[in-house]
């Protein structure tokens, strides 16, 4: 699918911009992000979140979990673009309360909800439940696999947003994946529109 086919329509762009406005405003009272100027945030938060759309759209239909959602990236942009039932999980109550407020303000609280707590506890409450899990700059690939695998349904995908992809880390993650009943699907590196920020999208699937 081409970049044009992944581009937001007018309504989606309005919601993406509104979300970013809400984040910048809320950041004055709640520490959500260190990136607060509009242009940088558009690239490093919004564009970065949407960069995973090709991989996200290959996932099976079904509920979506964003681990360590923070300010709602990539969870809210991906919910806006895909319309998936979305759960934004974070261990910090101030952040999940802000995310609830964002979803209500954006009018997407019919598909977006939050979970305040540890991912390990969520996996006990909703095992094998999610068709898609995302994690953005959160932890090592091996750690993400260990957290996500109990939550994923058979055939479900873990889409990892990384600042870079090191072959040694990926090889170790592939070994861990096999032990967890997961398998490596793909790795794609790219540069954001600022011309200097490198990113990688790495995907695993539950067998």
What is the role of each PLM region?
Residues 1-65, 94-97, 101-110:
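Class I SAM-dependent transferase core
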Residues 4-9, 84-86, 157-159:
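A short, structure-level motif marking secondary-structure boundaries and short turns
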Residues 25, 80-81, 153:
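Residues at the C-terminal ends
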Residues 60-61, 83, 181:
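Residue-level detector of structured alpha->beta connecting loops
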Residues 66-70:
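Conserved S-adenosyl-L-methionine
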Residues 71-83:
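Conserved SAM-binding loop of SAM-dependent methyltransferases across substrates and taxa
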Residues 75-77, 87, 91-207:
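S-adenosylmethionine
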